[in-house]
Regions:
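C-terminal scaffold of the Radical SAM
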Residues: 1-134
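Accessory beta->alpha helical hairpin/"wing" motif in late/C-terminal subdomains of nucleic-acid enzymes
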Residues: 157-167
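Conserved small/polar residues in nucleotide/adenosyl-binding loops
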Residues: 169-171
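A short, conserved structural fragment
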Residues: 148-157
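Extended hydrophobic-aromatic, low-complexity segments
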Residues: 125-126, 137-139, 154
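Alpha-helix C-terminal capping/helix-coil junction sites
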Residues: 34, 147-148
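Long, charged, low-complexity, helical-prone intrinsically disordered regions
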Residues: 70, 148, 163-164
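Short amphipathic alpha-helical interaction segments
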Residues: 134-145
């Protein structure tokens, strides 16, 4: 997470902890929550068993979703778009989808890996092959290198980041 300059905290420009301190704090938080019965199911989400966010799963699974209202974002049939943030334009019917982009299969592969590796479920290579009709050998080669350094692990065809691996992409 980052500080946005136009926010009160961003304008104060506080001194933030260095990357190592942030990583140590993150790992300590993961251990504390784990000891207290919370499962770490996504890089910045913890929940008691059975209480994972169902809403966010659509994003992590790259499913279609429709956002309605000013500033709402949608992803439908390989197309990403948003409505204007201006509520008056939205109410008057003048708000048409903007920031439209067609998302290529190649980009969707990258997004699949990016969002799935944020979750404890990880990225299933069989699922990736079936969705995008690609060889996963290059990805698996990278995962094996990460595994040697304790940053990734796998169960069958599913690869996921370890807590140490998550701490590096979290900061």
């Amino acid at each position: 997470l980052k500080l946005e300059p136009a926010t009160p905290m961003g304008r104060e420009n506080p001194v933030l902890p260095d990357d190592d301190t942030q990583a140590d704090t993150y790992l300590a938080m993961c251990r504390l929550l784990g000891r207290n019965g919370f499962e770490h199911y996504e890089i910045s989400n913890f929940a008691k068993p059975g209480f994972r966010s169902q809403h966010n799963f659509k994003y992590w699974d790259l499913s279609d979703y429709l956002g309605l209202g000013p500033g709402a974002h949608s992803f439908l049939n390989g197309r990403r778009f948003a409505f204007a943030r201006d509520i008056r334009a939205y109410i008057s019917g003048e708000s048409i989808p903007q920031d439209e982009e067609e998302v290529s299969d190649f980009r969707r592969q990258g997004e699949y890996l990016m969002v799935r590796l944020r979750t404890s479920d990880g990225a299933d290579m069989h699922d990736l092959e079936n969705r995008y009709h690609v060889s996963t050998a290059p990805y698996e080669q990278v995962f094996r290198m990460l595994e040697k350094h304790g940053l990734a692990a796998h169960e069958g065809t599913r690869w996921y980041l370890t807590e140490q691996g998550l701490s590096l992409i979290h900061i």
